[in-house]
Regions:
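Extracellular/periplasmic Venus flytrap/periplasmic-binding protein
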Residues: 85-89, 96, 134-135, 143-253, ...
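Extracellular/periplasmic periplasmic-binding protein-like sensory domains
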Residues: 249-326
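Signal peptide-proximal N-terminal region
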Residues: 53-75, 168-171, 200-203
Length: 390
């Protein structure tokens, strides 16, 4: 984990019916259904939309490449507005559609908690890359959850170790005050147990400052920050909450170089309205940052956006949240590729087979480069017990 600074015919009628049967059957076969749970509307749309665009573009790119061993991806979006109830509604509507869902990626911790109870029954895996339930990294217990690349406990631990290093060692955190400004939801509460344990271990004070959805009202929170002057502020926000927090830090004179955001608090929408005042603010990177020069980005532009087949604005291709959607889609299709290697290349797989694929992934340097992700993310592999990947 790293930190970064934000910155079809008339001719056909002449053919015999038998000549038409084979191609029609072929066209109807070999489609793998990937439902896409998105939020392009509501207060979190500025962050949810680029992720959804990246996710869509990569699946389109896979089809432009010929699919996974010839199997094309069929996608259907369902708008959730970041509502857990609507995520469940979309899940129930799409799980049996188009031959059955292959995998779901809810992009919501609340949604992840709700679907975790359903996935084992319906035998459909959940990918929650960099989000969801931290304990679900244990594949021995959570057999259908895959919090690939990182969990919130990993993120919180990384932040504590980083500020400890900045202070001259973890022992130097004794007596210091770390404030957690968090989205008052399942998402925002995820790091608390880890941080409480670390506070007990190292003797620092942990101040918990919840912020109500959607996060535009933070005056009282930052008045407390101004009064207490914590040594560090950890920001666990999403959507407008992030930019609001940075603006309030400016207004109260809290140094941005003492602020550290989780990877969902470190993207372009979080700082663009703050401008130069965001200088010094730090955020975790979920392996990648903005990747405008990545091979996969250039391929997306050439094969999709240059031909009018892209999703969303061309200029966002390669931005942080767009890349996160792109990577999340890639993780799913590579899980599908691994499953095909066991259950039959060129065949449509089941959700249960997909689970096996996700549990046996090995993304090597060579493999990542061949997909266009060289230099974008590190190698990762999963197994029966490790569903996060190492």
């Amino acid at each position: 984990m790293k930190l970064h600074k934000l910155m079809l015919g008339t001719a056909a009628a002449a053919l015999g019916a038998s000549a038409l049967l084979a191609p029609v059957a072929s066209a109807q076969a070999a489609e793998q259904f990937f439902p896409s749970l998105v939020y392009r509307t509501g207060p979190y749309a500025p962050n949810g939309t680029p992720f959804a665009n990246g996710y869509s573009d990569y699946l389109r790119l896979v089809n432009e490449r010929g699919g996974i061993n010839g199997v094309k991806i069929k996608v259907e979006e369902c708008e959730t507005g970041y509502s857990t109830a609507r995520i469940v509604e979309c899940y129930e509507r799409l799980k049996g559609a188009n031959g059955g869902a292959t995998v779901f990626q809810p992009l919501s911790t609340g949604g992840t908690f709700a679907l975790t109870e359903k996935a084992p029954v319906d035998k459909i895996p959940l990918i929650t890359a960099g989000l969801g339930r931290s304990e679900s990294a244990d594949g021995g217990v959570f057999k259908w959850n895959f919090p690939l690349l990182g969990t919130y406990w990993v993120a919180a631990d990384t932040l504590v170790q980083h500020v400890g290093k900045q202070a001259g060692g973890l022992a130097k955190l004794k007596g210091k005050n770390i404030a957690l400004i968090y989205h008052d939801s399942a998402y925002g509460k995820e790091p608390i147990p880890l941080l409480q344990k670390r506070a007990e271990m190292h003797g620092f004070k942990l101040t918990l400052l919840p912020v109500a959805h959607p996060g535009v009202e933070q005056k009282a929170t930052w008045l407390q920050v101004r009064r207490d002057r914590p040594d560090y502020v950890f920001l666990w926000g999403w959507g407008v909450m992030n930019s609001t927090a940075i603006k309030e830090a400016v207004a109260t004179g809290y140094p941005r170089n003492k602020m550290y955001g989780v990877w969902w608090s470190g993207a372009e929408p979080d700082v663009k309205d703050v401008g130069a005042n965001a200088k010094g603010y730090n955020a975790l990177a979920l392996q990648h940052g903005a990747e405008k020069d990545a091979s996969v980005v250039k391929e997306v532009l050439a094969k999709l956006h240059d031909k009018g087949k892209g999703t969303g604005p061309r200029e966002e291709v390669g931005d942080v949240l767009y890349m996160r959607g792109l990577i999340s889609a890639m993780l799913a299709t590579e899980g599908m590729r691994v499953a095909q290697a066991k259950y039959g290349k060129g065949k449509v797989i089941t959700g249960e087979q997909m689970r096996w694929g996700l549990e046996n992934m090995n993304l090597t340097d060579i493999g990542l480069r061949s997909l266009g992700f060289g230099g974008v993310m590190r190698t990762t592999s999963t197994n029966c017990s490790d569903h996060m990947g190492a």
